[in-house]
Amino acid sequence: MSGPNPNKQPVELNRTSLFWGLLLIFVLAVLFSSYFFN
């Protein structure tokens, strides 16, 4: 049981970091677009 857990954790962390990175880029794009439109 202790085998699959550590193996699965890095993949989950990688996916979460990727998701947060995309979210951050999206938020930055929205902020920049609103700034330029203003």
Curated annotation (Swiss-Prot):
Main location: plastid
A Pfam family it matches: PsbL
Top-level taxon of the source organism: Eukaryota
Location in or out of the cell: Plastid, Chloroplast thylakoid membrane
InterPro entries, per the entry: PSII_PsbL, PSII_PsbL_sf
GO cellular component terms listed in the entry, alphabetical order: chloroplast thylakoid membrane; photosystem II reaction center
Topology in the lipid bilayer: Single-pass membrane protein
Transmembrane segments: 17-37
Keyword Nucleotide-binding belongs to the record: no
Keyword S-adenosyl-L-methionine (UniProt): no
Keywords: Chloroplast, Membrane, Photosynthesis, Photosystem II, Plastid, Reaction center, Thylakoid, Transmembrane, Transmembrane helix
GO BP of this protein: photosynthesis
Family recorded in the similarity comment: Belongs to the PsbL family.
Subunit structure: PSII is composed of 1 copy each of membrane proteins PsbA, PsbB, PsbC, PsbD, PsbE, PsbF, PsbH, PsbI, PsbJ, PsbK, PsbL, PsbM, PsbT, PsbX, PsbY, PsbZ, Psb30/Ycf12, at least 3 peripheral proteins of the oxygen-evolving complex and a large number of cofactors. It forms dimeric complexes.
Function: One of the components of the core complex of photosystem II (PSII). PSII is a light-driven water:plastoquinone oxidoreductase that uses light energy to abstract electrons from H(2)O, generating O(2) and a proton gradient subsequently used for ATP formation. It consists of a core antenna complex that captures photons, and an electron transfer chain that converts photonic excitation into a charge separation. This subunit is found at the monomer-monomer interface and is required for correct PSII assembly and/or dimerization.
Protein name according to UniProt: Photosystem II reaction center protein L
